[in-house]
A protein has these predicted regions:
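Thiamine diphosphate
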Residues: 141-191
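Membrane-interacting alpha-helical segments
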Residues: 6, 83-86, 156
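Acidic-residue sensor for enzyme active/binding pockets
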Residues: 10, 33, 150
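Cofactor-binding active-site loop characterized by glycine-rich and histidine/acidic residues
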Residues: 14, 21-141, 162-166
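Cofactor-/ligand-binding subdomain signature composed of acidic, glycine-rich
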Residues: 1-25
Length: 191
């Protein structure tokens, strides 16, 4: 899937949301397509991918068919998409997938399975205690878990750098999330 296809899918979801066809929250992406495509070149079918509530692009890049993904979103599950047969899981709980990723990494290592675990988290989630503990555990036990921090410079509606006041020491990619608000698609839709 290329960047144009990702954007077209997300645009369709935004239109459906604004038309009141999705009676649940949606968290849409825009501007991070090329970064994710680059990362997913190294993600294999046997690898696990874990994400936060903003996971439409990751699902598509992991191989979930667009119509299957769209059906789950229309059913109100946009922020907790789970497709075990494609080895992709997400959660609306901030940092909720991080300990699961560590557990999957332990399982992969113990079973000697030829798989990796890729976990995507936001810039503010990366500053939580659970994130630091999970990253340290992965490092200490040499688990096959890779953390991808998606830094859109905002945590909900707060500028992340202003709220934390520090210089980052982690490997991140950054993008401007200017097309969509934190939740929704720009129109106020009553459920």
């Amino acid at each position: 899937m290329n960047a144009e296809q990702l954007v077209a899918f997300e645009t369709e979801i935004a239109e459906l949301f604004n038309a009141g066809k999705i009676a649940a929250p949606v968290h849409l992406s825009h501007g991070n397509e090329e970064n994710l495509i680059r990362i997913f070149k190294d993600v294999r079918p046997q690898d696990w991918v874990l994400c936060s509530w903003r996971s439409h692009y990751q699902c598509l890049l992991k191989g979930v068919p667009p119509e299957e993904l769209k059906a789950e979103i229309l059913a109100g599950r946009s922020i907790a998409l789970n497709f075990p047969k494609y080895r992709i899981l997400s959660s609306a709980i901030v940092g909720g997938v991080l300990p699961i990723a560590v557990g999957l990494g332990m399982g992969v290592q113990l079973s000697r399975e030829n798989a990796k675990v890729h976990v995507f988290l936001g810039d503010m989630t990366a500053e939580t205690g659970v994130a630091h503990e999970c990253m340290k555990y992965v490092q200490n036990f040499n688990l096959p878990v890779y953390f991808h921090i998606e830094d859109n410079n905002q945590s909900v509606c707060t500028d992340t750098q202003k709220s934390w006041g520090f210089v980052s020491h982690t490997d991140r990619f950054s993008y401007n999330a200017t097309k969509y608000p934190h939740a929704g698609a720009g129109e106020r839709v009553q459920f």
